Amino acid sequence: MDKQALFDQIKGGLIVSCQALEHEPLYTKEGGVMPLMAKAAAQSGAVGIRANTVRDITQIKEAVDLPVIGIIKKDYEGTPMYITVTMKEVDELVACGVDILAVQGTSALRPDGSTAAQFIEAIKAKYPEQLVMADCATIEEGIACANAGADFVGTTMRGYTPETQGCDDIDFDFIHELSEKCPAKIIAE
């Protein structure tokens, strides 16, 4: 799907997160649950799916004809980063055909010492046609990631970083300001 067609398809719609970590009730070793959730979301009018792990993304893409935002969640020692942190994970997501590749776009450094903006630049250099989403917590992070090449900026990390602790409610003023100042398309959570 071309970039503009994808933008048009998801604009103003609901993207449903279909993911379960190993310690959560909907996780199964063999998979199969997340594609069922994605089917239910598609039947209910979702315009896209957000999914974690190559296995679940691959199964979801076989089950529904919706754009998939793909991530790999993994904890790394010495950094609070956990959403698609390394180029190895990027390579795996690109190989499984994610429509939008999401990375953590917060101000913390990655294990290799790079910033979110530097990581996005490296992704775009390696995969210039791959759509990239930066999961951010602040307006400054969103702008920096967009300027580095992120096609989308998500409010995913708002309330989950030291700078934004306590921002648990839906913050329409934040979303509005981000959409006014950030050159990328905004995906609000």
Predicted segment positions?
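Hydrophobic, well-structured mid-protein blocks that either form specific transmembrane helices
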Residues: 93-137
